[in-house]
Amino acid sequence: MTPQEMWNAYKQINPSIGDEIDAWAFGVDPDLLADLVFTGEKTATASAYDLYALEDEPLHQEGTFDVILDSQDQAVCIIEITKVSVQPFKQVSADHAYKEGEGDKSLAYWRQVHEDFFKDCFGEAGLTFTPDSKVVLEEFRKVYPL
């Protein structure tokens, strides 16, 4: 299903969502992570704050809706953003790591894989990642299909 087709189907249930679609795939292993969202295992994500600023891209806002895509840019589900916060990488909580639903869901696992990921992203942008680098933490819930 295309993002537009899924959006149109959900709009029949929730007409207030409007016409503008924000569709995206997770940067690493989009099929696995999209499936974790679909099954309800993954209800949070993290991204690099400095990259939003570098690309002059606004942060997601609570109450907005996104279409989650797989690696083939096909729609998997629609989520509603329920919480957005910014904090240093080193202050991310075990609770947030658990909500991300990846690996063994521990903070140690989360820190290991996200530090590697953020170092690569920062390096590609000519920046240096440190434990004090800010991350954008988002929580969400799947709203379609239920």
Can you describe what each PLM-predicted range is?
Residues 1-78, 87-146:
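Mixed-charge, low-complexity intrinsically disordered regions
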